[in-house]
Amino acid sequence: KGELIYFADQKNFPYGVKSKKELENIIKDTVNLLEEKFSPDFIIMASNTPTLLLDYSRISKKLAGIYPPLSDAGKISRTRNIAILGTRSVIQSESVTEFIEKCNVPNDIVIHKIDCSLLVELVESGKFLTDEEYCKNIIKEVLEDVFLDNLIDVATLSSTHLPFLEPFLRSIFKNVKFLDPAKNISNVLKDFVENNDLQQNVLRIFTSGDVNLFKKNLQMMGIDDEVNFLTI
């Protein structure tokens, strides 16, 4: 039996406006806490921001990150214009520029980096669960002009908050393909579970924020598991 620990670090949200040093300290403290309390075999850092900004292998060999699937985007774009949708700190960083240079993306592809911090906030606040019209208006405000002006037809959801908005995104931008970066790391985790004979999993959920509010939002998504408080 395997135990899956989900830790929502709401206390330190948003990661997207933190400095590199602040992020490094947060991730170090979080990993230390998780290792001391749970002794995990594998830790997924389910955020593109620290994945791209930090040399996380120096923090722990157990850590795995989530990266924008740019190679996949480049293969399917017909207009040769793709977008990275991410937090402000990622979009403005040299790290994402270096990552782009390392990716196997054809030379004729134009990559547009778009600050989607306002969209991340829609998810973190739970607004996406209660006010569809408001969320769609914010999405249009952030993305509509840049998508249309640049003929963008593929976008990577390079914040793990953004896939929660995918139904809205698809309904507004019917000719744009949105790629979820979590799918690649989920395959890695699946292989790990199968190779270690962990066929039945138990989910335990923790937050460093408001337990009752987080539980309420989870229930609205059909998740009725117990939520406990945990903080670094």
Predicted regions located by residue number:
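Non-catalytic structural scaffold of enzyme domains
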Residues: 1-232
